[in-house]
């Protein structure tokens, strides 16, 4: 009998193993059973042609919706069509490690420039004790430059070496959410009226992001049972990145657009938003997972017995590619990023 860990590892290995077996056996069988391989390649080609047709159809559909959403004044729609938007509070989490002030400033400036009432927004700078000096410096600059731009700016430092966690964004976010739960309780806010947004620290959001998000949240039949997923772009440093990184970045965006049009298969990815009620019910982001952005969807799906979904947002958030000054290091960073996402 296999232990729980051994079964977990087996299931974890299977996707990668199947890919490598397909590649290796394709070469071996070309010599051993060439006729088999001819049939296999024909079927494989037909399969991929159908996948491309399917991909292009949903990509075109999403692109049309994306263009329409960008032309819409969501703030105006929110103010004139809704009566319940003013009781919503936005809590924006920005997890920090060793990023520079320029990166953090650009992200917070984009939130500050958003078309939404800033007194309804709380910015959370979630830093690490391992990089205490950088965290304190960044927090000081944020509070100095943006003191009058938001309802509040909260700094939370994640202690190092806590038990039963893996250091990373997931554990940092888990700790910050638990601390913010106390903050929200002190304010007396209803969890169902608090919308949590988790941005990567380099995220530049669309000016209409929070108005659009609020509109979707207020018009959704069951807003606490849904996450809200924007289109991920990697435009911040696109033209400073090697060609291969640019191609992969556009590929990720195309995949994201296709996924948005297929809501039945859509899960959260990268920067996104959700109800704080859902976060609490799911037990917060998993502190034993580094790449937590898609994991939280499955936590919510299980917590709500399958009654959970992702609502597409056809506006962009832009982030950095994983470029480095050295070309080879950029490729290694890209491989690690793709492996982490997988």
PLM feature segments, named:
Residues 1-81:
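N-terminal membrane-anchoring/stem segments of glycan-assembly enzymes
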Residues 67-326, 339-340:
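Internal catalytic domains of large membrane-associated glycosyltransferases
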Residues 329-342:
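Catalytic core of nucleotide-sugar-dependent glycosyltransferases
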């Amino acid at each position: 009998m296999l232990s729980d860990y051994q079964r977990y590892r087996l299931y974890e290995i299977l996707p990668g193993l199947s890919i490598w077996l397909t590649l290796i056996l394709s070469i071996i069988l070309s010599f051993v059973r060439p006729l088999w391989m001819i049939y296999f390649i024909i079927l494989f080609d037909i399969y991929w042609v159908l996948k491309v047709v399917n991909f292009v159809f949903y990509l075109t559909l999403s692109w049309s919706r994306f263009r329409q959403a960008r032309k819409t004044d969501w703030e105006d729609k929110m103010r004139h069509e809704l009566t319940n938007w003013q009781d919503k509070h936005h809590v924006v989490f920005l997890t920090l490690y060793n990023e520079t002030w320029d990166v953090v400033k650009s992200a917070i400036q984009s939130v500050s420039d958003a078309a939404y009432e800033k007194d309804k927004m709380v910015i959370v700078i979630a830093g690490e004790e391992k990089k205490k000096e950088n965290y304190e410096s960044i927090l000081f600059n944020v509070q100095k430059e943006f003191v009058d731009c938001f309802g509040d700016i909260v700094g939370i430092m994640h202690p190092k070496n806590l038990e039963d966690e893996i250091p990373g964004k997931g554990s940092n976010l888990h700790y910050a959410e638990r601390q913010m739960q106390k903050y929200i309780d002190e304010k007396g806010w209803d969890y169902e009226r608090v919308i949590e947004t988790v941005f990567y620290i380099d995220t530049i959001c669309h000016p209409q992001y929070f108005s659009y998000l609020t509109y979707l949240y207020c018009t959704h039949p069951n807003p606490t049972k849904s996450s809200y997923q924007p289109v991920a772009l990697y435009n911040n440093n696109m033209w400073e990145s090697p060609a291969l990184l640019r191609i992969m970045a556009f590929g990720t965006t195309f995949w994201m657009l296709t996924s948005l049009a297929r809501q039945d298969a859509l899960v959260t990815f990268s920067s996104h938003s959700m109800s704080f009620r859902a976060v609490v019910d799911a037990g917060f982001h998993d502190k034993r997972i580094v790449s937590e952005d898609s994991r939280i969807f499955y936590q919510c799906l299980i917590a709500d017995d399958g009654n959970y979904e992702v609502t597409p947002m056809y506006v962009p958030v832009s982030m950095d590619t994983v470029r480095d000054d050295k070309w080879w290091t950029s490729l290694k960073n890209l491989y690690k990023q793709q492996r982490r996402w997988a």
